[in-house]
């Protein structure tokens, strides 16, 4: 059979009315319509590569922040408590995570110890003494503050004399030095303003600026190399400033809490006479402003939220948010709904502010939504019914209480004492919350510590 030959040439369309055999001019393929799309040339510039990497990292960072924010929002309702047994120690006032499994704590009975949250093992750390330890006569005050420097290489806390500042090296907790010639009363609060400079706030109404110089660190290393007995230096303050006392009760001008804004190099301070003070804190301390707090009773805790540029101040029943750039009448406050027991500790994590109360409660305030987190309705059989809109509240466990003479004489008819949350801190992952404290009445002897995870 003969093979039919098909022409590859395209015939021109017949004009209207033309015969079927009419032939128009022949046209080839329109190559302009059928050219293959060319890929853009690969850019091999280092600048182009770095720019792409920057954009990618920005996207990853943004995603990570969203993820952390979501976790912070959901975590509180999932936390479960595991208590630690601290023996006969009295009231844990301060705590900080050293690493993923160790927390260092300070107590009213002037004990510094490390708890391993995995094994529950307690290790006591020797406290540092003044040049003249015989001068220490004060009892019942203890260690109120523990702070790590930004690089987490030094730890600052109180000494054997509660008026003195003690510095330890991390991670070994070897002693470095003691600042023992500044304050005339107990140190209530400490804030690092750089890797080598710390500020202490005292009950005598003064703020001390201390510097751990390279010379002090070098001599400390040399002493440890030649002696197995802990040997440490004694340093003097670089500056000592009194908080303003005008128009206030001078007997109540006690520096109770400090918080540092690293971006602006500003140090916030709260005094027990109901004032917030702001200082420029670099190589010295310079006062910027003082403002009366809207709720001025029992102002004992302070935290700074760098992302929100606000200070959170705890009082008897409220948390107040201060932005130093705004007028004082713009201060926003929220009520804890636990009147009388006081806000004892406060902290920022992402957009959630954790509040510890004197009644042993942990509350969680969402600064974006401007409301406390609420309970989730539980459908579990046998669970306690909860009202919709009720604040989410975690309550500390029983802890330990000494049934001593004070308890027998004044409190024996009371079945249960809640443990005030004097201190709490999140680990670096934000998934573990260490909480500690003890009974609120000053005469009672007891303790509480727990890990919420």
UniProtKB/Swiss-Prot annotation:
Biological processes, Gene Ontology terms: protein ubiquitination; regulation of autophagy; T cell activation; ubiquitin-dependent protein catabolic process via the C-end degron rule pathway
Basic residues biased stretches: 1-12
Residues modified to Phosphoserine: 15
Annotated spans, Required for nuclear location and interaction with MOV10: 1-38
Function, in words: Substrate-recognition component of a DCX (DDB1-CUL4-X-box) E3 ubiquitin-protein ligase complex of the DesCEND (destruction via C-end degrons) pathway, which recognizes a C-degron located at the extreme C terminus of target proteins, leading to their ubiquitination and degradation. The C-degron recognized by the DesCEND pathway is usually a motif of less than ten residues and can be present in full-length proteins, truncated proteins or proteolytically cleaved forms.
UniProt subunit comment: Component of the DCX(DCAF12) E3 ubiquitin ligase complex, at least composed of CUL4 (CUL4A or CUL4B), DDB1, DCAF12 and RBX1.
Family: Belongs to the WD repeat DCAF12 family.
Protein known as: DDB1- and CUL4-associated factor 12
Organism, scientific name: Homo sapiens (Human)
């Amino acid at each position: 059979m003969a093979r039919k030959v098909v022409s590859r040439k395209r015939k021109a369309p017949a004009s209207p009315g033309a015969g079927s055999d009419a032939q128009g001019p022949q046209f080839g393929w329109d190559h302009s319509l059928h050219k293959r799309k060319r890929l853009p040339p690969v850019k091999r510039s280092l600048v182009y590569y770095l720019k792409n990497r920057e954009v990618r990292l920005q996207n990853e960072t943004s995603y990570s922040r969203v993820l952390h924010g979501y976790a912070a929002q959901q975590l509180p309702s999932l936390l479960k408590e595991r208590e630690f047994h601290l023996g006969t120690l009295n009231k844990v006032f301060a705590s900080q995570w050293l690493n993923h499994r160790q927390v260092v704590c300070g107590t009213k009975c002037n004990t510094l110890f490390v708890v391993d949250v995995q094994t529950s093992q307690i290790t006591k750390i020797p406290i540092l003494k003044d040049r003249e330890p015989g001068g220490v006569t004060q009892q019942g005050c203890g260690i109120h503050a523990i702070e790590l420097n930004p690089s987490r290489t030094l730890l600052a806390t109180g000494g054997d004399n509660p008026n003195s500042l003690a510095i330890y090296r991390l991670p070994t907790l070897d002693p470095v030095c003691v600042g023992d010639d500044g304050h005339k009363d107990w140190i209530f609060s400490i804030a690092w303003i750089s890797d080598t400079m710390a500020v202490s706030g005292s009950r005598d109404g003064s703020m001390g600026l201390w510097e751990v110089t390279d010379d002090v660190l070098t001599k400390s290393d040399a002493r440890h190399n030649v002696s197995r007995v802990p040997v440490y230096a004694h340093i003097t303050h670089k500056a000592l400033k009194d908080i303003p006392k005008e128009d206030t009760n001078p007997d109540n001008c006690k520096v109770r809490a400090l918080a540092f804004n690293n971006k602006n190099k500003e140090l916030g301070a709260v005094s027990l006479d109901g004032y917030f003070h702001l200082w420029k804190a670099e190589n010295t301390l310079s006062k910027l402003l003082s403002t009366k707090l809207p709720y001025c009773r029992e102002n004992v805790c302070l935290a700074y939220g760098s992302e929100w540029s606000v200070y959170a101040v705890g009082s008897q029943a409220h948390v107040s948010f201060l932005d130093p750039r705004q007028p004082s009448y713009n201060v926003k406050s929220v009520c804890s709904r636990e009147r009388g027991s006081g806000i004892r500790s406060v902290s920022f994590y992402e957009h959630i502010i954790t509040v510890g109360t004197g009644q042993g409660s942990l509350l969680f305030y969402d600064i974006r939504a401007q409301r406390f987190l609420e309970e989730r309705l539980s459908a579990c059989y046998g669970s306690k019914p909860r009202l919709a809109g009720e604040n989410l509240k975690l309550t500390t466990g029983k802890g330990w209480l000494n049934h001593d003479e004070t308890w027998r004489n004044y409190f024996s008819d009371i079945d249960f004492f809640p443990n005030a949350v004097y201190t709490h801190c999140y680990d670096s992952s934000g998934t573990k919350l260490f909480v500690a404290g003890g009974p609120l009445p000053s005469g009672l002897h007891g303790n509480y510590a727990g890990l919420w995870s």
